[in-house]
């Protein structure tokens, strides 16, 4: 018969794909935490630089920074 019960279909193994095989190593370290601070200082530096970038963009948008030789309408 071509029909399956719910029990039989729940036992089916997931289909393996090429993309899944490539991504599996990325998920193998799930839940593990490296000891120490790791790359936290680098992330803090990146966040600080991004905050500076955003503040510069905001100041230019608000025309609170005088730009020599550039006329803004």
Swiss-Prot record:
Residues recorded as bearing Phosphothreonine in the entry: 3, 5
SUPFAM superfamilies the UniProt entry points to: Photosystem II 10 kDa phosphoprotein PsbH
Molecular function in Gene Ontology: phosphate ion binding
BP term (GO), one: protein stabilization
One Gene Ontology cellular component: photosystem II
Regions that span the bilayer: 41-61
Protein's cellular compartments: Plastid, Chloroplast thylakoid membrane
Keyword Ribosomal protein: no
Region span, Disordered: 1-20
PTM description: Phosphorylation is a light-dependent reaction catalyzed by a membrane-bound kinase; phosphorylation occurs on Thr residue(s) in the N-terminus of the protein.
Membrane topology label: Single-pass membrane protein
Name of a matching Pfam family: PsbH
Alphabetical keyword list: Chloroplast, Membrane, Phosphoprotein, Photosynthesis, Photosystem II, Plastid, Thylakoid, Transmembrane, Transmembrane helix
HAMAP family cross-referenced by the UniProt entry: PSII_PsbH
Functional description taken from the UniProt entry: One of the components of the core complex of photosystem II (PSII), required for its stability and/or assembly. PSII is a light-driven water:plastoquinone oxidoreductase that uses light energy to abstract electrons from H(2)O, generating O(2) and a proton gradient subsequently used for ATP formation. It consists of a core antenna complex that captures photons, and an electron transfer chain that converts photonic excitation into a charge separation.
Family: Belongs to the PsbH family.
Quaternary structure and partners: PSII is composed of 1 copy each of membrane proteins PsbA, PsbB, PsbC, PsbD, PsbE, PsbF, PsbH, PsbI, PsbJ, PsbK, PsbL, PsbM, PsbT, PsbX, PsbY, PsbZ, Psb30/Ycf12, at least 3 peripheral proteins of the oxygen-evolving complex and a large number of cofactors. It forms dimeric complexes.
UniProt name for this protein: Photosystem II reaction center protein H
Organism: Oenothera argillicola
